[in-house]
Amino acid sequence: GREIMRSLVEAARACPSIEVMEGAQALRLLQDGSGAVSGLLVRHGGQEHVLSAAETVLATGGIGGLYRVTTNPPEARGQGLGMALAAGALIADPEFVQFHPTAIDIGRDPAPLATEALRGEGATLIGRDGAPFMARHDPRGELAPRDVVARAIAAEIAAGRGAFLDCRSAIGAGFPDHFPTVFAACVAAGIDPRLQPIPVAPAAHYHMGGILTDLWGRTTLEGLSAVGECAATGAHGANRLASNSLLEAVVFADRIATRLREGASAARTAQPAPAPPELGAEGLQTLRAAMAADAGVARDRPGLMRLADTIAALEASYGPASEILAARALCQAALHREESRGGHARIDFPATKASAARSFLTLHDLG
């Protein structure tokens, strides 16, 4: 992934037909009289700019920044999803959020990861008393699926027993050589994983839902495509497999580029529009805490109703900011899905229904 990013940035900077606007913030999608997307309103250098485009491609990342503990950059907090909702796009499966079970719990934002490869090498999850606990939750132990391990760790933390990843016997002195990134994160926090267990906690990691697209990246709005984590291609179902998001981003980005290259869209001219409301820093912290408490690894109706009330209060104070719209979509879909499936776990509906069904909604459905 890092090498793909490096080479793409290098190629983009070298391409004379690409203008790079670093530090620009997308504010809203602009539309013509027919509802087709005609460009973007952005803020760059303290000024607002209208960017016209025959085709606008959203690649804004996920929603991890809507949660108090996340592995995502804090800037990735559902803005693309919210902008698409505000423009009338169809959203799919927003309730499905994957939580990485073993973020290193050292108070950093974003939280560094203790990779699953550590458990693959034999590291065990233990409580504060040093006793392993995964066998009590699932016969597959440390190698159970991500959502199962994340819920087990959350339950142990909620019960006051804590959760730690013990790598001392399985990896020991070889830690710095085999897992240098994790080792550096631990040492920076004053933890030597060769000698001490690593404190861990679940963290919002990947959003399986997003802006509905077809197999060529088209959304339900003319002139708008979406790719990467902000898109809902259906490729990940209810629970993404590790590393598949990289494959999805590469494949669907190439398909969008091929489509646009082979079938040039008609030129569009975007008209200026006012900037939408923005969620202030205090409101964002309130939302992140509420999302973590009530739409995390285990959900129930009382918690989701409490979250809906919090979101409504924030919208009354700040207006329909993109983050608020994204959170509303997730909360409503989670309330309506009365089952547990993949990254969506309802403790009041623990069974999985025999027939699978996707969730679809628009801004109109949010009321």
Segments predicted by a language model, with ranges:
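Short beta-strand to alpha-helix junction loop
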Residues: 1-10, 21, 70-78, 103-107, ...
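Feature captures the FAD/FMN-dependent oxidoreductase FAD-binding
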Residues: 1-44, 49-50
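Glycine- and aromatic-enriched mobile tails/lids
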Residues: 32, 126-142, 152-153, 206-208, ...
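Core beta-strand elements of the Rossmann-like FAD/NAD(P) dinucleotide-binding domain
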Residues: 47-55, 220
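Alpha-helix capping and helix-loop boundary segments enriched in small/acidic/polar residues
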Residues: 48, 67-75, 109-113, 117, ...
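Glycine-/small-residue-rich beta->alpha transition segments that form the dinucleotide
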Residues: 53-55, 59-64, 230
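An anion/pyrophosphate-binding glycine-rich loop and adjacent beta-alpha core
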Residues: 83, 89-198, 249-250, 259-265, ...
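FAD/FMN-dependent oxidoreductases across multiple families
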Residues: 180-224
